[in-house]
Amino acid sequence: MTIQLLQYQHISLYLIHSLIGRGMEESKGRRIKRSLLIKPSSVKFLESNEIEKLKRVNLISDYIDSRVTEINEYNKKYDIDKSMLLNGRNLTNLGVFRIYIEEYLKAHPMTNEDLTLMCRQLEPTSQGIPIQIYTFSKDKEWTKYEGLTSDIFDHLLSSVKYFDLECFELSQNISN
């Protein structure tokens, strides 16, 4: 298929495939933009024993150390009563999981560190809290790209339980 473009004095013909395919071929990577849906009731503040457990995860141990120091300084400065976890600032399992995802993607040899990489929380829906992964693969070939995307999400789906989070699932129970 071709498309005709009128350019001032003459008409040019272009193959549609060449207009569509060129951007991907000339880019530095293929975009991965996909979400995990987290069950809202599984999100919670982290207790000190849970924080200590997560410090053993290499990718996030430095983050947890610096964040705990920052939070403790804030809570001390404002004389926050921490006998109630709800008071003051705290780490959440979902917040730490988002950092884990970003660090995992940064460390992955097949993601392109020169392009945008982020993990963000989108607006909650009736199907849960979307945690969106936005990054680029180094390899643009479709089957390799799909394999990489699957490998990343296999890992993340397996990692959810270590943060005491649950993925949203529609109930199979149907009552009349």
Cite the ranges covered by each PLM segment.
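Long, non-transmembrane cytosolic or organellar matrix-exposed soluble domains/tails
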Residues: 65, 69-70, 77-176
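Soluble accessory domains appended to multi-pass membrane transport proteins
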Residues: 1-80
